[in-house]
From Swiss-Prot:
Protein name as it appears in the record: Transcription initiation factor IIB
Zinc finger (TFIIB-type) boundaries: 11-42
Keywords assigned by UniProt, alphabetized: Metal-binding, Repeat, Transcription, Transcription regulation, Zinc, Zinc-finger
Family to which the UniProt record says this protein belongs: Belongs to the TFIIB family.
Amino acid sequence: MKEDVAEMEKKETKCPECGSTKLINDHERGEVVCGACGLVIDDNIVDMGPEWRAFDHEQRDKRTRVGAPITYTIHDKGLSTMIDWRNKDIYGRDIPARNRAQWYRLRKWQRKIRISGATERNLAFALSELDRDSSRLGLPRSVRESASVVYRNAVENKLIRGRSIEGVVAASLYAACRRCKVPRTLDEIADVSRVSKKEVGRTYRFLTRELHIRLPPTSPIDYVPRFASELNLSGVVQSKAIEIINQAMDNGLTSGRGPTGVAAAALYIASVLLGERKTQRDVADIAGVTEVTIRNRYKELTEQLDMGVNL
């Protein structure tokens, strides 16, 4: 194999017909063509590069297969190694008893080296907390990555001092949910993060102000798929609810209204119209609002949009 590669490297760098050194490598056709006379010098060149394409540095890191991709959800970005707790070598054979004490010491020092400093200890604890909260909320990996970046930026800008790690993690998670359009309410974030809703909201406003994070208001439409899924409503009902919300937005009926309440009322109306009726209590429990809120939003939407729906 080495001889073949060496032979390929020694191939002529000029056209044997006209002597021109202006050679063109056409990788799509697998040919080397003379740019002067058009002679096809080689019609079977091999592309030694990867079979994938990457359009930026981050994509390249993720697609290369010479190691795990960089991730912001681990304090060292996944770049370090660790010694496995099982006392086996790379072939699966047990390590001799006389060497196990040495492996124990190596494993101990490896753990210390991976987390060597106050900042890394902070990140290690915070990111494990973030992973726990994300798992309980069922959030996708993209949200976890985004939340990890927000938290890291807060650490770099020294915004953690005087605030609880749990509170900053919860606020970062809330910001990431809004950025990725995977909405979760402050109540849901507070329930899993062991901090109050008030602290999460206050820390979120502080981070967005200090880190100059600009996030658009949450749309009621973003809540429809999740609420509909939990209520076992069909896709037709979801589409109808989104249609109702769009009409409400066009008529300015969502201004100053909580997005969860509007989404819940629209789903309730759509379920009644299409014969998949759910009780107000069921919808209210899923949306995290009161039945009174649903009735108020229901009344506004049906009257202003001229819908003939009976409770």
